[in-house]
């Protein structure tokens, strides 16, 4: 028997109104900034509980000549997500965000059940950074003809899904590609924004966009806490001691970048540096690998590298974390 997940509504949609002191608005392109002129006006984030209403809202924006930026998420928003939204706000007339905990990309039902959810808190954060619309839905609303996840034929995610995360989480990238296609068709964005923290996923999504002919995929740098730990929705599941222990992932990656800048180029030697740092941190390493970011391969590289992406997955207690770092450039946001 395949995976079976009960389909149910997981969020309630309250529509709080936020009073603002406004007069007329000042046009900044097709985006409008309020001015402070003394009259009371109400501005709210549009919250839509299903993909069909979201589709109509986005179609109206495009019909009015507005560019639509899109940030797909599974909720439990943190500074990494908000950085994507801010980038989208800066580059588009309107921005929408999806919040959908996608059962298709979970191998373990317990992991799905454990995934943090707080729609109202997420919506409040989105409103503060200038998002115009947020929507969600159930699996059955996205796939009306099915009642459980294992009835859905998932999309082939392509060769970039092979190895590493694809090997550790069979079916994960098929689930990602399948829901991203649905979300793209709902929103019809000109640009969609993803974080480099999920590096292999970004390759899969770029391939999907090439096959669909849209949207432009904008991959933004990983955002880190002051400790160097990459922001992740799963970080809230860590104890204080585990949170400190988890910093060994980023420490290993930045040690590797220093080795690269000091002239080390051999793939095997670089991987040895990374493994040494991770073993010193005491985490349970699932993989610690290098890949050419421009030419994905299932096999680990050997010999000298011209450019390199270091990728790691490890368990800290019961929490599985991933991280990665481009070695031949310096553009992560946060502590190094």
Give the role of each language-model region.
Residues 288:
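Catalytic, metal-anchored helix/loop core of enzyme active sites in primary metabolism
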Residues 1-9, 15:
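Extreme N-terminal basic, low-complexity initiation segments
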